[in-house]
From Swiss-Prot:
Active site: H247, C309
Superkingdom of the organism of origin: Eukaryota
Bias (Pro residues): 20-56
Keywords, in A-Z order: Apoptosis, Hydrolase, Protease, Thiol protease, Zymogen
Composition bias, Low complexity: 57-83
Species assigned in the record: Cryptococcus neoformans var. neoformans serotype D (strain B-3501A)
Start and end residues of each stretch annotated as Disordered: 1-149
A Gene Ontology cellular-component term: cytoplasm
Name recorded for this polypeptide: Metacaspase-1
PANTHER family the record matches: METACASPASE-1, METACASPASE-4
GO molecular function terms attached to this record: cysteine-type endopeptidase activity
EC number: 3.4.22.-
UniProt record similarity statement: Belongs to the peptidase C14B family.
Highest classification ranks of the organism: Eukaryota, Fungi, Dikarya, Basidiomycota, Agaricomycotina
Record carries keyword Transmembrane helix: no
Length: 463
C-alpha cells in the first residue's frame, strides 16, 4: 500500500529506539511522587493491548466519526473488517458525532462556565492585536550558490483556512504505569476546539486506547500515520492542531543536537515492541522522517500541546520564550556550524554579544567555503511556517496526571482550556502566564512556550 493510499503506509520504522530512558528524576531528588502524579516514562508493560478494556470510571462515548480523509469522510459499517481508504485515509466506524460540550459521558471535567469577567488576561498592556499577514524577515543575509543572497523569513498564519486536529490520549490501561486522565484530555481538547475555534468533528482524528476502531488505537504506526494525515495538503493560513497526553521521557542523544544530551520521546501504547517516538522523528531535522514541521508551507499554523513529562522541547523548536516574552534559551547557537548564521540573532540579548560576533565570523567562513550551506540552513529546526508548541513542563520536569473539579485530567490540558475559557482574547505571553497561574501552588511543573521562528509574543493567540 502506497503512502498516498494510507498516510504513513509503508512508513519506515526506525530501529534502535528501544525503551532506554535515563533514571527517573526522583532517583536523585528523594522518593518518588505519589501515584499518578507524574507522566514518567512507563516500564515495559506486561502485554500489548490490541483491544484494551475501558479504564475504570470511564464510560465509552458513542462511536465518533474521525477519519483520515482530506476532504471529509464516508461512513462504513463497524462490522466490516477491511478499512477502505479514500484520498489518503481510512473510513471510521459509523455513529453520531459527539455533542459539542466540554463534559462528556461523566468522564471529563467541566471548565469554568459563564461569561468571563474580562476578555483579555491581566498581563501586558491593552488588548492584543492579530498577527501581521505579510512575510517577516529576520537575521543576516545568507549567500548561496551563484552569489545570490537571501534573508530568512517566516509568515504568521491568519488561521482562516482549513482546520484539522489530531488528539492523542493514552491511559496505558492495565499496565503498571496506567494513567487516569489522558483519554479525558483528548476528548476535552476536541470539544474545546469545536466550540471555541470552529473546528469540525469530521476534521479531528482521535487516537485513544479505548477506541473500538483498531485504526484509532494509539500505536506507533497509527500515530505516525495520523501525523502524516495532519500535515498532508497544508496551505498558507491553514490551522493544524496537535495534542498529546500520555507518558513522555528522554533517551540519549546520538548526534549532539541537544544541549542536555537527551532527545525527548513520547510513548505509544505499543512502545515495548514498536519503540518510542523521538522528537527528531517528528521534526525531521535529521532527515529521518518528514512528518510534522518540515512539510509545512510559509503561513501555515501548527499548534502543538504536549501534556507529558520532559516535554519542554518535545517538538524540537529553537525559540523558547520566558514569561516576559523574550527568548530565554538561544538553542540556535549550537547550530551555527550547520550553516544557520543565527536566525533571529537580533533577538538575543544579555551577554551573548561577544559570542555572536565569533559565531558570525565562523558562519561567514562556512558560507564562503561550502556552496551547500544554504541547503543545510534550510534543514535546521527553523521554518517559514508558523509552528507553536505549548508543553506541560521543562525537559527536566515531570507533568502531573491529576484531578481537577473531581475529574481525572492532565494538569497542562486542564490549564490550557481553563486559561482560554476565563480570558478568550490573550496574547502568547499572556496565555503562558495564565496557564502557569492555573497550576501555581498546586504543581511544580512550569509550562513552556516555543516556536519555529522569532515571534512577537504580544500578538493575539489564535488557532
Amino acid at each position: 500500500m502506497s503512502w498516498n493510499q494510507y498516510p504513513g503506509g509503508g512508513h519506515h520504522q526506525q530501529g534502535g529506539y528501544g525503551y532506554r530512558p535515563p533514571p527517573p528524576q526522583w532517583a536523585q531528588q528523594g522518593p518518588p511522587p505519589p501515584p499518578n502524579m507524574g507522566y514518567r516514562p512507563p516500564p515495559p508493560p506486561q502485554a500489548y493491548y490490541n483491544n484494551p478494556p475501558p479504564p475504570q470510571q470511564y464510560q465509552r462515548p458513542a462511536p465518533q466519526q474521525n477519519g483520515y480523509q482530506q476532504g471529509g469522510y464516508q461512513q462504513q459499517q463497524q462490522s466490516q473488517g477491511n478499512y477502505r481508504t479514500s484520498n489518503g485515509g481510512y473510513v471510521p466506524p459509523t455513529g453520531a458525532p459527539v455533542e459539542a460540550s466540554y463534559h462528556h459521558t461523566g468522564a471529563g471535567y467541566t471548565p469554568p462556565s459563564g461569561t468571563p469577567q474580562r476578555t483579555s488576561a491581566p498581563y501586558g498592556a491593552g488588548a492584543p492585536i492579530r498577527p501581521p499577514s505579510q512575510a517577516q524577515h529576520y537575521g543576516p543575509q545568507l549567500q548561496g550558490q551563484g552569489g545570490q543572497s537571501a534573508q530568512p523569513y517566516f509568515q504568521y498564519s491568519q488561521c482562516t483556512g482549513k482546520k484539522k486536529a489530531l488528539c492523542i490520549g493514552i491511559n496505558y490501561v492495565g499496565s503498571s504505569s496506567a494513567l487516569a486522565g489522558c483519554i479525558n484530555d483528548a476528548h476535552n481538547v476536541q470539544k474545546f476546539l469545536i466550540e471555541r475555534y470552529g473546528y469540525k468533528s469530521e476534521d479531528i482524528v482521535m487516537l485513544t486506547d479505548d477506541a473500538r476502531n483498531p485504526r484509532q488505537i494509539p500505536t506507533r504506526a497509527n500515530i505516525l500515520a495520523a501525523m502524516h494525515w495532519l500535515v498532508q495538503g497544508a496551505q498558507p493560513n491553514d490551522s493544524l492542531f496537535f495534542h498529546y497526553s500520555g507518558h513522555g521521557g528522554q533517551t540519549p542523544d546520538l548526534d549532539g543536537d541537544e544541549d542536555d544530551g537527551y532527545d525527548e520521546v513520547i510513548y505509544p501504547l505499543d512502545f515495548k515492541t514498536a519503540g518510542h517516538i523521538v522528537d527528531d522523528d517528528i521534526t525531521d531535522c535529521k532527515g529521518r522522517h518528514n512528518i510534522m514541521v518540515r512539510p509545512l508551507p510559509a503561513g501555515c499554523r501548527l499548534t502543538a500541546i504536549y501534556d507529558s513529562c520532559h516535554s519542554g522541547t518535545a517538538l524540537d523548536l529553537p525559540y523558547i520564550y520566558s514569561t516576559e516574552g523574550v527568548i530565554k534559551e538561544p538553542n540556535l547557537l549550537a547550530e551555527a556550524g550547520q550553516g544557520l548564521l543565527s536566525a533571529g540573532m537580533s533577538y538575543l540579548r544579555g551577554d551573548t554579544g561577544g559570542m555572536l560576533q565569533g559565531i558570525m565570523g565562523i558562519g561567514k567562513k562556512v558560507m564562503n567555503q561550502n556552496s551547500g550551506a544554504m541547503e543545510k540552513a534550510r534543514q535546521t529546526k527553523t521554518s517559514p511556517a508558523d509552528v507553536i508548541s505549548w508543553s506541560g513542563c521543562k525537559d527536566s520536569q515531570t507533568s502531573a496526571d491529576t484531578q481537577e473539579a473531581g475529574r481525572a485530567t492532565g494538569a497542562m490540558s486542564y490549564a490550557f482550556i481553563a486559561a482560554l475559557t476565563k480570558y478568550p482574547q490573550q496574547s502568547y505571553v499572556q496565555l503562558l502566564n495564565t496557564i502557569r497561574d492555573e497550576l501555581k501552588g498546586k504543581y511544580d511543573q512550569k509550562p513552556q512556550l516555543s516556536a519555529s521562528h522569532p515571534m512577537d509574543t504580544n500578538i493575539l493567540f489564535i488557532c
